[in-house]
């Protein structure tokens, strides 16, 4: 190495400008060394941090590979070959992790320690000495300046001694500090070379040691293992490429074949309806009620499984039972202005669901499939052939149910056509009960023969016009089977203390001959249910029944419009079915025609959600409350009448007392007028005014009238 530049320590006492200039060069060199070594320290520290991170990451990788066999993967989790291969890799990588850990330790000792010691000890020592030298130099200059200003004329031994002592102390301090400072700067020229070379030497030795350990660990067995793994990876890659090519071809074929199916409602000529299905799956919109008038439609995947209709929401692992469709009824319905809707009703009528298909084809296929399953065709040996024989009934279910007027006109007998004596008029809106064919015991004493049955609530009765009523029935009968009568526009239930709401479905109504025994309700239920079964009428109008102390109201769940109002005093009988407590009915007594004396009774039958007895109890409670309210009203009116009589008697008594008071006043005046006559006889005279004379005349007249009375 070339010679080392040095500062002359022997010239520190002289402190010449040349020495100071040379000191400035060494200080500039020290500053450059400090900046460069800081950058080199940061670079080596990054190497050390990276090596530590590599060691930790390698160890973590080995740990994760060991835990692979403990993982539970949904697919391919039981691959023993993969597990054993990863275990072997884990061992090799764990050995590499140990080598990296050794390398990290060597880098810390051989590379980071020397450069850190130079940075933290030697460079900081130079900075400290520089600051101390600067302070000592300033103090020496100040002492020399004070010594130079000593007065020649006015010498003061004490001041001179103090200044001289100050110069001595400051010069000594500067000299000593400067010598140590020069020594440190001269030593720095050696230390900077050591600080540069020693960390690099340690780094290279650590790397060589690391590579030697790696070479020792890499044996022939490991090379063979890596070669086998490379071959396996190439085989898997070739298999993947082949599978990708097959899937791409399948995608292209499916895109061409499925193009017409992208349309929501495909052409029925290209994709005809299959009416012989006994299994079906696909997405449907299900109607769910969220309130009295609100509802939501949820899209779910539905599929049939034997005699069950299953539903599965997106994200669910498995499907759940939506409805038992054995012996169920299915029909197309109109719901909330949506297309392709159909309703499924369970065999017992307790549960019903409204679903919406995506297309007309799906709509008809779902109805046909459910209709086939409901007849248990899927249990036969050849379900498709059996389903073909019942296709006609499925087609009838696809067509939406006609209205009451249409069904009535379609089923009305033609003019001049004879009918059996026991037959009754048959229609979906007005049908005969046909009791002779449906019951062994005739109850004509309760229900008149040939009585029409009303199955639909055609339209609500207008309640805004007083005295208005609708006439139903046949043969010119001007009756109101729903018991509607005119009333004021004020709500009848505003002040009612009882408000109970129930969900009911209207089954039918018919006129009855008696209203004094529950058998009337039972017989009406029997005839209406039998007529519905004969004519395959499954649709029921759902309403909300509001029970108050004034009336019973049927309210439309969708629009909250009152369909029918039954005055509570006209409800004379109510009862539930003896076996099926969901069925209940009541008899309404109304005036028939224009004559108030001609009364008729109509029985209404409803189905509820296991609340038949509760509804009857609520009606009974409403009638009791109404009865007590009527009694209280009558008692209040009677009390008011008594108070009016007492008030009238009190007024008469007060009037009589006033008359008596007036008579007493008149008598006093008459007595006063008789005193002057006595005084005149004694020679004294009293002059009466004209007013007093008039009062006396009035008093005499009053006495005359009293005596005459």
Curated annotation (Swiss-Prot):
InterPro entries named among the record's database cross-references: AH/BAR_dom_sf (IPR027267), BAR_dom (IPR004148), DP13A/B (IPR047181), DP13A_BAR (IPR037929), PH-like_dom_sf (IPR011993), PH_domain (IPR001849), PH_DP13A/B (IPR047236), PTB/PI_dom (IPR006020)
Basic and acidic residues biased stretches: 645-667, 700-709
Domain PH: 277-375
Cell location: Early endosome membrane; Nucleus; Cytoplasm; Endosome
Biased composition (Polar residues): 674-693
GO biological-process terms attached to the record: adiponectin-activated signaling pathway; cellular response to hepatocyte growth factor stimulus; insulin receptor signaling pathway; maintenance of synapse structure; negative regulation of Fc-gamma receptor signaling pathway involved in phagocytosis; positive regulation of cytokine production involved in inflammatory response; positive regulation of D-glucose import; positive regulation of macropinocytosis
Molecular function in Gene Ontology: beta-tubulin binding; identical protein binding; phosphatidylinositol binding; phosphatidylserine binding; protein homodimerization activity; protein kinase B binding; protein-containing complex binding
Domain PID as annotated: residue spans: 496-656
Keywords on record: Cell cycle, Cell projection, Coiled coil, Cytoplasm, Cytoplasmic vesicle, Diabetes mellitus, Disease variant, Endosome, Membrane, Nucleus, Phosphoprotein
Tissue expr: High levels in heart, ovary, pancreas and skeletal muscle.
Chain positions with Phosphothreonine modification: 399
Disulfide bonds: none
Domain of life of the native organism: Eukaryota
Changes after translation: Phosphorylation at Ser-410 by PKA severely impairs binding to OCRL.
Modified residues (Phosphoserine): 401, 410, 693, 696
Coiled coil location: 215-259, 621-673
Record region (Required for RAB5A binding): 1-428
Disease implicated: Maturity-onset diabetes of the young 14: A form of diabetes that is characterized by an autosomal dominant mode of inheritance, onset in childhood or early adulthood (usually before 25 years of age), a primary defect in insulin secretion and frequent insulin-independence at the beginning of the disease.
Function per UniProt: Multifunctional adapter protein that binds to various membrane receptors, nuclear factors and signaling proteins to regulate many processes, such as cell proliferation, immune response, endosomal trafficking and cell metabolism. Regulates signaling pathway leading to cell proliferation through interaction with RAB5A and subunits of the NuRD/MeCP1 complex. Functions as a positive regulator of innate immune response via activation of AKT1 signaling pathway by forming a complex with APPL1 and PIK3R1. Inhibits Fc-gamma receptor-mediated phagocytosis through PI3K/Akt signaling in macrophages.
Domain comment (free text): Overexpression of an N-terminal domain (residues 1-319) or a C-terminal region (residues 273-709) has a proapoptotic effect. The F&H motif, an approximately 12-13 amino-acid sequence centered around Phe and His residues, is essential for binding to OCRL and INPP5B.
Complex formation: Homodimer. Binds RAB5A/Rab5 through an N-terminal domain. This interaction is essential for its recruitment to endosomal membranes as well as its role in cell proliferation. Binds DCC and the catalytic domain of the inactive form of AKT2 through its PID domain. Binds PIK3CA and subunits of the NuRD/MeCP1 complex. Interacts with OCRL and INPP5B. Interacts with NTRK2. Interacts with APPL2; interaction is independent of follicle stimulating hormone stimulation; interaction is decreased by adiponectin in a time-dependent manner. Forms a complex with APPL2 and RUVBL2.
Protein name: DCC-interacting protein 13-alpha
